[in-house]
């Protein structure tokens, strides 16, 4: 039913095991394969969302199935954040847990099938999704340090049910799956049966259409990569790891190509905004030269500074803590929420500390005398959002050096700053 050869060299195979029909069939197929072939260790993960009382009994059911299949089970309890979409919040919590489990190269198998593919296309059409939303669920994609794989996409729900019955498998029927207040359940229970009665191949054709849309998206992604190769040039060397694009290169593109390039770039960093919220790009792009526009997105924000747009997320969304003593400057100093610093060069006196700008700082620059730090940062074209978190090296009240700016140093040393992680939390 499925081909597992591409993933035989993975360190570990995991199965997202809800206990329902799809994941039970998937776990059985993998367990049977592992019993008869050399393969990576197989483990199951059950996510307990705590959203309904019936779910409290599901871990025990899953444990019994796993014991029967001789598969190790890990049960993870998650907190689902309240919001407009309970379905989306539960999905976010679930995939965040999966990302935490997966190590480098690990594979997470999930049980989505052809009917899921069709329902997803119809659901997103009704929401007015663009090509990226309408394209087929990929058979494989990155997830955390590993990959998510959907080996059942060519199988129908009926095919899985027939297999389960033939193998004598038992599974959980989630009562929430028949609650038609949820959009996906309404499509599955009320809409798709009528469509299939009139067009028996509806699910298969929807899934095929999603594959065609995926091919078209692939071509647009190739175009985006070409455009981003140009827009990515010229990033300041002083700020490694901080993602940015050249605004002029984007402005040279048509509006449609701008949006296509940004969709591709942002899709690797955040959940994409809906059509209505794309007005934020125009506001950011067209703001006055002296403005400091911000486009807030689901998992971070875009800001504009010195002719570039910059992606900020994770620690970059919070201001770092205040002054921090550096008792051992021979080793690196970790800065809470702001990466770490180290000294390179001649020996420096004891009693050092790292602090951040308060305003009015002066630095003795060799050959130039005392200079106002604000003016020096302007000369160096330091982005405005960096200035409040730029590590400053002090000896007592004397400013000795500014991180990552070799010209701004009083002592015979350099202060190297490893920037904080620009965290990405995509599912």
Curated annotation (Swiss-Prot):
Any GO molecular function: tRNA(Ile)-lysidine synthase activity
Superkingdom, taxonomy of origin:
Bacteria
**Gene Ontology CC, one term:** cytoplasm
Q: What biological processes does GO assign it?
A: tRNA modification
SMART domains this protein is in? TilS_C (SM00977)
Q: Return the EC number.
A: 6.3.4.19
Keywords, A to Z?
A: ATP-binding, Cytoplasm, Ligase, Nucleotide-binding, tRNA processing
Where is the protein localized? Cytoplasm
- InterPro entries listed in its UniProt record: Lysidine-tRNA-synth_C, Rossmann-like_a/b/a_fold, TilS/TtcA_N, tRNA_Ile_lys_synt, tRNA_Ile_lys_synt_N, tRNA_Ile_lys_synt_subst-bd
| Ligase is among the record's keywords | yes
Q: Where does ATP bind?
A: 18-23
Pfam families xrefs: ATP_bind_3, TilS, TilS_C
Q: Work out whether the entry's keyword set contains Thylakoid.
A: no
Catalyzed reactions: cytidine(34) in tRNA(Ile2) + L-lysine + ATP = lysidine(34) in tRNA(Ile2) + AMP + diphosphate + H(+)
Q: Which family does it belong to?
A: Belongs to the tRNA(Ile)-lysidine synthase family.
**Domain comment (free text):** The N-terminal region contains the highly conserved SGGXDS motif, predicted to be a P-loop motif involved in ATP binding.
Report the PANTHER family cross-referenced here. TRNA(ILE)-LYSIDINE SYNTHASE-RELATED
Q: What does this protein do?
A: Ligates lysine onto the cytidine present at position 34 of the AUA codon-specific tRNA(Ile) that contains the anticodon CAU, in an ATP-dependent manner. Cytidine is converted to lysidine, thus changing the amino acid specificity of the tRNA from methionine to isoleucine.
Q: Output the NCBIfam families linked to this UniProt entry.
A: lysidine_TilS_C, lysidine_TilS_N
Supply the name of the protein: tRNA(Ile)-lysidine synthase
Species per Swiss-Prot/TrEMBL record: Pseudomonas putida (strain ATCC 47054 / DSM 6125 / CFBP 8728 / NCIMB 11950 / KT2440)
